Amino acid sequence: MDIKRIILYVIVALLAIALFNAWQRDYPPTPKPTPTVEQPTANGDHPTAYTPPAFTPGAAEKTKKAGTIALTSKVSEARLITVRTDVLDVEIDTQGGNIVSAKLPKYPVSLEEKQTPVQILSGEPNELYVAQSGLTNGNGQPTTVQFESEKKQYVLENGQNQLIVQLTGRAPDGLLVTKTYTFHRDDYAIHLAYQVKNNTSKPWQGSLYTQITRRQPPTEHHHFYVRSYNGASMGSPQTPYEKLSYESLDKQNIDRTSQSGWIAMQQHYFLSAWVPGNPELTYHYYSHVIPASDEPNVYVVGFVSPQMNVAAGSEAATHATLYVGPEIAKRLKGLAPGLERTIDYGWLWPISMLLFWILSAVHAVFKNWGWSIIITTILIKIVFYWFSAKSFRSMARMREMQPRIQALKERHGDDRQALSRATMELYRKEKINPLGGCLPMLIQVPVFIAFYYVIIESVQLRQAPFIFWIHDLSVKDPYYILPIIMGLSMLAQQWLSPTSPDPTQQKMMWILPVIFTVFFINFPAGLVLYWITNNVVQTLQQWYVNKTYESHKAKLKARRARKRKR
C-alpha cells in the first residue's frame, strides 16, 4: 500500500476528530443550574416562573424584569383553543393569546411511532417551550389580556387555503385589543397581527413584544458525529447568523438593537423563530435567564418593536411572523435573510448548499434520496477526476522511483543529511513533487466534510428510505451491512496498489480498513453509502489510470520530444 494513501486516510480521520472537537467547543456539556432560593409570593405560593419582558420607555427600550406568570401546572384545558391545518396542530392559551403547543403531523417521532408527531412547542412545565407575544404600556410593563374567541376549535378544511383565528379582549387600561393569527395551507409560518383601539380619553403608548420561552432541554446522547446544535440563535443585517448557546446566555444577556433581523430556538432538524413585521424599523433584541433550583433554567429570547402612539379614539396595528417547523432552506429564506443559516451546515456552508442543491435536483428525477446520494457522489468524482488521476499518476511515479531511492539508502547508509540531499536531487531531476499524490486528494476533503453536513443536517433525509433493509438514511445501518461493504471497498481499492516492500506498510494495508469499518459502524447510513460509492468510483478510476499509465507516460515523452525539437 502506498504511504501517500496512508497519510490521506490519517488526515481524514484527524479531520473527523477535529469536527468532534469543534462541536465540543460550539456545544459544550450542559452546566448544572445554579441553585436559587425562591421567595414566596404574597399568597404563599413558590413561583417556578418566568418573567415576561418589561421595557423602559425611550429609544433604547432596555429590558428589565417585572411581574411573574406562574408555570407550576399545565395550562387549563378550558383556556385552550385548538387549531389544525394540514401541517400544524396548534394550541393557543386565551390568557395572553400565546401558542403553548405546536405539533407537526407530517413528521412522526420515529418510524416505530408513525402516529406520534414531532412536538416543538409545549406548555408542560418540565419541558416548557412556548411562543409568546403581547403589548407593553408606556411604562414598559407587559399587559396581560384575557382573550375570547368565537370557537374552541379551528380546522383548515379541504379546499380552504387560509385559516384566521381572531381573539378579542380588553386590557386593564381599557384598550380594546384584537389579536389575529393567520394560518396558510402547506405553510409553517403563522402571521400575527395586533390591532389596538383606544376607547379611553387618554393617549396610549406601547410596543409589541414577541419572545420564545424555553426550558433547557436534556442533553441528547448522540455519537459525536451526529450531534447537532440545540440552542438559541439570531440574525441581523450585520451578522446574518449567530449562535447563542445556553452557556453564553448564562454569562450575558442579549441587549442590542437592529433593523429587521430574527430570533430563534433551534434543535436538530426543527426550529421556532420570530420575525419582525416591518424590516425597515429598528427593534430591540433581548434575553434573560430564569434560574431554577430543581430543574434546568428557563431561557427567554425575543424582540420589542418601536413604541406606538395611539391618540384617544384612534387605533393602530402592528404585526410579526412566527415560524414553527422543519429547517427547509427555501421556506426560511423567504421569511428573513440569514434564517436559512439555521440549517447548521458548518463552516463550509456555501459548499454544502451547492451540494444540497445538486442532491435535490437529482432527487427530483429519481425520487429516492439513497440513489440521489449515489448519483451525486458519482458526479462529484467525475468533476474531480483530473485531480484524482493526477494523484494516481504521481503515486505511480513515486513507486517507479522506489528502487533508485533504495539504492540511495544503501549508498549513503546512516548519513541522513546526505540521503535527504540525494533524494531531493533525484526528485528535482525527475521533476517529481513528493507531495503530488496527496495534495490533489486533499482538495477533495472539504467536499467530503460539506457532504457530511448535508447528510447529517438536512431534514429531507430524516426517515428517508433507500432499498431493502435501509429504512432511514439519517441513522446507522441496523445490521451493519453498509460499514462492512465499505471496509471491503477499501480493501479492493488497496488491492489495486502494488504491495509495498515495507512490512509496516503491508500491515497497515490490512489494519486501516478494519479501523475505518469500526469508525463508520455508527455513522448514518446515508454517509456510509456516500463513502462506499466514493471508494468504488475511485477504485474504478484508479484501475483505469493504472491501465493507461504507460500509454500516458509515452504520450508525455513524445510531447516533450516535440518541444525539444522546436
From Swiss-Prot:
Gene3D superfamilies: 2.70.98.90. It holds the Pfam family 60KD_IMP. One of its GO terms (biological process) is protein transport. Keywords: Cell inner membrane, Cell membrane, Chaperone, Membrane, Protein transport, Transmembrane, Transmembrane helix, Transport. CDD domains: 5TM_YidC_Alb3, EcYidC-like_peri. It comes from the Bacteria. GO terms for cellular component: plasma membrane. It is a multi-pass membrane protein. The chain crosses the membrane at residues 3-23, 346-366, 369-389, 436-456, 509-529. InterPro entries: Membr_insert_YidC, Membr_insert_YidC_N, YidC/ALB3/OXA1/COX18, YidC/Oxa/ALB_C, YidC_ALB_C, YidC_periplasmic_sf. It is found in: Cell inner membrane. GO terms for molecular function: membrane insertase activity. Disulfide bonds: none annotated. Interacts with the Sec translocase complex via SecD. Specifically interacts with transmembrane segments of nascent integral membrane proteins during membrane integration. Required for the insertion and/or proper folding and/or complex formation of integral membrane proteins into the membrane. Involved in integration of membrane proteins that insert both dependently and independently of the Sec translocase complex, as well as at least some lipoproteins. Aids folding of multispanning membrane proteins. PANTHER family: CYTOCHROME C OXIDASE ASSEMBLY PROTEIN COX18, MITOCHONDRIAL, OXA1. Belongs to the OXA1/ALB3/YidC family. Type 1 subfamily. This is Membrane protein insertase YidC. It comes from Coxiella burnetii (strain CbuG_Q212). The lineage of its organism: Bacteria, Pseudomonadati, Pseudomonadota, Gammaproteobacteria, Legionellales.
